[in-house]
Amino acid sequence: MEAFKDPVIHIYINSCGGDAYELFGLLSVLDVAKSKGISVHTHVIGVAYSAGSILAAYGDHRTMSRYSDHLLHLGCAGAEFSTFEQLKREAENNIKHFNKILRIYSEHTKIPKKKLEEMLKDDKLYLDAEQCLKYGICDEIT
């Protein structure tokens, strides 16, 4: 197979979110691409909510349209359990999951983990393009 002349993956995002476990799988694929010298550019052309926001922040170069918004939050948790041990195990898994999300944002933005925890204490944080630029969630407003 011929080598790519421009080793860049462009991902255009207009997403209300999705399953975090599927997102983590996609981020792992992007890590493999990055390890092969392929750059990942993300472009928010609508909204980047929840998992879409994490994907957008993961790019090596990140753009947003001036009308775009991000929604940052730590995810949703909850289900019916029949035993206390099941509930306890699910809570432990959710804490690991939330910490993984915090780590991804803190590694790929200008927001330190402690500051992000404070910003998300009320669960959901909506940010417009200017705010995303300020916090290093995007690199450029288009």
Model-derived regions, located:
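A short, well-ordered alpha-helical element
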Residues: 1-7
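Short, well-ordered alpha-helix to beta-strand connector turns
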Residues: 6, 59-60, 138
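Extended, non-globular alpha-helical segments
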Residues: 8-32
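Charged, glycine-interspersed solvent-exposed loop segments at helix/strand-loop junctions
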Residues: 9, 79-142
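Glycine-rich beta-to-alpha active-site loop
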Residues: 17, 25, 33-79, 120, ...
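Solvent-exposed, acidic/flexible segments
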Residues: 19, 23, 49, 91-98
